[in-house]
Amino acid sequence: MQPDLTPNPAPPLIALTGIGKRFPGVQALDDCHFDLRAGEVHALMGENGAGKSTLMKILAGVYQRDDGEIRMDGRAVEIADPRAAQALGIGIIHQELNLMNHLSVAQNIFIGREPRGRFGVFVDEAALNRDAAAIFARMRLDLDPRTPVGQLTVAKQQMVEIAKALSFDSRVLIMDEPTAALNNAEIAELFRIIGDLRAHGVGIVYISHKMDELRQIADRVTVMRDGKYVATVPMADTSMDAIIAMMVGRQLATEFRTPPDTSANDVALEVRGLSRGRAIRDVGFTLRRGEILGFAGLMGAGRTEVARAVFGADPVDAGEIRVHGKTVSIRSPADAVRHGIGYLSEDRKHFGLAVGMDVQNNIALSSMRRFVRRGLFLDARALRDTAQSYVRQLAIRTPSVTQPARLLSGGNQQKIVIAKWLLRDCDILFFDEPTRGIDVGAKSEIYKLLDALAADGKAIVMISSELPEVLRMSHRILVMCEGRVTGELRAADATQEKIMQLATQRESTVLS
């Protein structure tokens, strides 16, 4: 299905047709289409991993397309790099803002392009601030160009990013989750500025998962799924349910099984009233022995933040944690490990795995003391034998336990981290995106391993952005949105549509 193009005498401001992008072993985009009109807000939607960011990075010159064509004002263009995109008037505002806190607002806007004095040596500070003030006047924004960016709120910093894009005379603005860290008043101010930009003919690509916002701001919506174009429809003519159905599709190419009933098992972990700023807001849940509790939600929902807080990696403002019925104080990962809690990070190569060390030392990383004799000597044989035992138990494919971890596949690296926590006798395990970056065969092995750990009585929280994976593995599913738990689903009742409904709303619900 091609993009919906209402008859219009002018060609689209931007038109991407048949876009394909391949990375080693992965077809990231396949025959994708997207167009943007002048003075339009066009929403781009899809699950995490649908290909939205890749498509927009091609438009912004970060990636190069392998197939397809890009036209601007009806003429074919090549966007070789971000500078070429800027020259064409295409600006992108990432969710992670790209500003320097120690520089002023004006310096951030014109960095590398500062106006110079008579001899072209020194920056003309007066002209710099005057040019920045002119952009803010256009935006109807009261902001002192001399203020250090580090002193601004996130909302104001976002306005600086918009001003920076406008300083390039941008006709196209790509906004990636622009309201993720904003409150309602700040969102209203952002929408006012978007309205002004639209009135001046700027086309805006708006990437968001927040349905209520899209109703307010978007003219059309394009949906992507699994790197493919699904449909483009006028926002006024579609429903939230229809958009969700397009996002998740109807085919679940995943093996399902009936989860065991763990409702009578002992509670291993109970969390009450956990809060940390806007990232975690009054989160509570229970986790039973032998249970896999799935944490679902969209990017920025707060799932990883909850796991890190329970593990003691980040401080909290409030909350109570009970392990096997006893209230515990967890102020650091060492405290969590002492209470039998392990955490497998979504970024295993930077947190959890020492890629420069060999397999055996990675497995023993959190338990090295048990291999030290007389407080001084390392029992190398005991270390090797223990590591070999876990290699056999978890079917870790490695030539030997002295093989450097960096030379193993992603799935085998993940098994090493699991072995580390099993050796440490952790009976409560947080798995954050456990199958990210590993192939289908390795995923199946990780699934079987998680099932086996649960059958052995381990209590598991599994955070995943892949809905089929959440449905395949979980005994219960907790859904989060904007730092809150918005609902809980029993495995037997859960569907992708129900999860997406909860992941895009802001009030708690229990669906059955």
UniProtKB/Swiss-Prot annotation:
Example of a GO cellular component annotation carried by this entry: plasma membrane
SMART domains: AAA (SM00382)
UniProt keyword terms in alphabetical order: ATP-binding, Cell inner membrane, Cell membrane, Membrane, Nucleotide-binding, Repeat, Sugar transport, Translocase, Transport
Subcellular location: Cell inner membrane
UniProt domain ABC transporter: residue ranges: 14-251, 262-507
Catalytically driven reaction(s): D-ribose(out) + ATP + H2O = D-ribose(in) + ADP + phosphate + H(+); D-galactose(out) + ATP + H2O = D-galactose(in) + ADP + phosphate + H(+)
GO MF: ABC-type D-ribose transporter activity; ATP binding; ATP hydrolysis activity
Chain positions recorded as ATP binding sites: 46-53
UniProt EC number: 7.5.2.11, 7.5.2.7
Bilayer disposition of the protein: Peripheral membrane protein
Enzyme class, first EC level, given as a word: translocase
Function as written in the Swiss-Prot or TrEMBL entry: Part of an ABC transporter complex involved in carbohydrate import. Could be involved in ribose, galactose and/or methyl galactoside import. Responsible for energy coupling to the transport system.
Family per similarity comment: Belongs to the ABC transporter superfamily. Carbohydrate importer 2 (CUT2) (TC 3.A.1.2) family.
Protein name: Putative ribose/galactose/methyl galactoside import ATP-binding protein 1
Organism: Burkholderia lata (strain ATCC 17760 / DSM 23089 / LMG 22485 / NCIMB 9086 / R18194 / 383)
